[in-house]
Amino acid sequence: MAEVQVLVLDGRGHLLGRLAAIVAKQVLLGRKVVVVRCEGINISGNFYRNKLKYLAFLRKRMNTSPSRGPYHFRAPSRIFWRTVRGMLPHKTKRGQAALDRLKVFDGIPPPYDKKKRMVVPAALKVVRLKPTRKFAYLGRLAHEVGWKYQAVTATLEEKRKEKAKIHYRKKKQLVRLRKQAEKNVEKKIDKYTEVLKTHGLLV
């Protein structure tokens, strides 16, 4: 069986429900999906209203034994995961298998920091929300309802960005050196280039 290509999505700047709906569909179709930077996901509506909604959800519990559920996740990645779960038939084998194909992370941990990350235009806030509309960040909401790792995630993200800057500078320098080297040997290999062109090996 062919290896299923992993779809790596950058959650920053996407709307929670719209992104969750698209991810839910993809995992049901058999794609493996990884969503990074879940703390940067947006929720439409002002922050205060969203916080009140989440605090109301925190009050939902089993009176006789709260440890039996419902479970209230505090991390942005788990809040997003639960949103996707609500859009899947997760109590069936098919739904459970689909949910197993989804991975969610706060920040961008290795090896995904070295991979190309994609966006979903249909779920982007700048595309779907009017500029005047209010919105909230999932990371801030999570922090105010009990997520303890906002500062840790922010520090790790800063370190990752610094590393990425250094890597990009080196890459640019290598490209520049390669171009310079090609220019330097261009005249020396002219006669060989002509021979290769006559044989149709170079266009």
From Swiss-Prot:
It holds the Pfam family Ribosomal_L13. The modification Citrulline is found at R59, R140. GO terms for biological process: negative regulation of formation of translation preinitiation complex; negative regulation of translation; translation. The keyword Protein transport does not apply. The modification Phosphoserine is found at S77. The modification N6-acetyllysine is found at K191. Keywords: Acetylation, Citrullination, Cytoplasm, Phosphoprotein, Ribonucleoprotein, Ribosomal protein, Translation regulation. Phosphorylation at Ser-77 upon interferon-gamma treatment in macrophages involves a DAPK1-DAPK3 kinase cascade and is causing release from the ribosome, association with the GAIT complex and subsequent involvement in transcript-selective translation inhibition. Citrullinated by PADI4. It comes from the Eukaryota. GO terms for molecular function: mRNA binding; structural constituent of ribosome. The modification N-acetylalanine is found at A2. Belongs to the universal ribosomal protein uL13 family. Associated with ribosomes but is not required for canonical ribosome function and has extra-ribosomal functions. Component of the GAIT (gamma interferon-activated inhibitor of translation) complex which mediates interferon-gamma-induced transcript-selective translation inhibition in inflammation processes. Upon interferon-gamma activation and subsequent phosphorylation dissociates from the ribosome and assembles into the GAIT complex which binds to stem loop-containing GAIT elements in the 3'-UTR of diverse inflammatory mRNAs (such as ceruplasmin) and suppresses their translation. Component of the 60S ribosome. Component of the GAIT complex. Interacts with EIF4G1. This is Large ribosomal subunit protein uL13. It comes from Pongo abelii (Sumatran orangutan). The lineage of its organism: Eukaryota, Metazoa, Chordata, Craniata, Vertebrata. The gene is RPL13A.
